[in-house]
């Protein structure tokens, strides 16, 4: 790939509905960055939570833009609002939850971008994880180096 810089302006993102009220505005697709990084802004209704999971091939970063989020990274539990930044290294079980009472927004990055391809594939399939069976989700996640290791820990 001939690497070039580029700018994604508001409104130019690829927007995907992950679940009712939960959207991802994909700012950087994995293939646009020569697999270096994948980035998106997520809108998460109150109570939205991920299962305890890990990524074998990528590190994850989450920056809270609005709302209040709780994090479990390894054995540590934390909660923070706007300006909070969480780093979730590869092979460390982690999860997050919008623990506030309002819709929250967060910016995510995966580096390298391989782990983010799971979202790109679900978007192309038009099948959010919430509409898939547990074995389907596990197979898709495994394909991109993810592993679900437990339910949401909150």
Describe these PLM feature segments:
Residues 1-37, 124, 128-154:
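A short, N-terminal "cap"/entry segment at the start of jelly-roll beta-barrel domains
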Residues 28-30, 50-56, 97-99:
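Short histidine-centered beta-strand/loop micro-motifs
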Residues 39-45, 54-73, 109-111:
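Short, conserved beta-strand element in jelly-roll/cupin
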Residues 105, 116-128:
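A hydrophobic, small-residue-rich beta->alpha segment in the mid-to-C-terminal subdomain
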């Amino acid at each position: 790939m001939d690497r070039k810089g580029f700018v994604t302006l508001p409104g130019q993102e690829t927007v995907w509905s992950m679940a009712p009220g939960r959207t991802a505005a994909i700012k950087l697709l994995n293939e646009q960055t020569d697999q270096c990084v994948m980035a998106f802004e997520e809108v998460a209704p109150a109570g939205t939570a991920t299962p305890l999971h890990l990524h074998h091939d990528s590190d994850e970063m989450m920056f809270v833009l609005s709302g209040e989020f709780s994090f479990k990274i390894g054995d540590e539990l934390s909660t923070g609002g706007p300006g909070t930044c969480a780093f979730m290294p590869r092979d460390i079980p982690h999860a997050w939850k919008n623990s506030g009472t309002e819709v929250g927004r967060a910016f995510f990055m995966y580096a390298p971008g391989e782990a983010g391809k799971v979202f790109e594939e679900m978007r192309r399939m038009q099948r959010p994880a919430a509409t898939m069976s547990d074995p389907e989700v596990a197979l898709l996640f495994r394909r991109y180096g993810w592993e679900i290791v437990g339910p949401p820990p909150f």
